[in-house]
């Protein structure tokens, strides 16, 4: 009888963990697919999913870090909108999005541009309700250069 309880608890915990992992997988897949459509390679290890924030790390070319910033925020916005649209109880919906872009300065040296925005702002960018120039002006207020 005791082993049956343990087996039941094990299966219950696996079921709960797998539903959370599938929400994470769907979120990461959506971000990767959007980045891929803009010819930006994205790996799962470049996404860090926290409880109420998602961090995206990217490496750009020398002169196009703005495009990487925009695509990073827009892809996260689309993934959040998709999670909301599915309406699942285990949906991953972070409140904050952080994007950091490494930009080469010289051989072997990088500047890191880091910006943060609320998920509603990123969804507005992804939906086209917010113009990209307006969005860049908004995130420039929080941008840090490391």
Model segments located where?
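Bacterial N-terminal signal peptides
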Residues: 10-18
């Amino acid at each position: 009888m005791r082993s049956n309880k343990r087996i039941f608890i094990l299966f219950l915990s696996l079921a709960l963990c797998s539903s959370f992992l599938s929400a994470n997988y769907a979120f990461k897949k959506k971000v990767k697919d959007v980045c891929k459509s803009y010819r930006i390679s994205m790996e799962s290890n470049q996404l860090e999913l926290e409880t109420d924030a998602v961090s995206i790390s990217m490496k750009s070319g020398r002169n196009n870090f703005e495009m990487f910033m925009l695509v990073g925020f827009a892809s996260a916005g689309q993934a959040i909108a998709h999670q909301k649209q599915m309406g699942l109880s285990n949906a991953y919906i972070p409140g904050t999005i952080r994007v950091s872009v490494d930009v080469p300065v010289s051989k072997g040296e990088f500047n890191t541009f880091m910006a943060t925005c609320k998920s509603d702002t990123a969804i507005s960018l992804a939906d086209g309700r917010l113009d990209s120039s307006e969005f860049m002006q908004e995130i420039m207020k929080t941008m840090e250069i490391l």
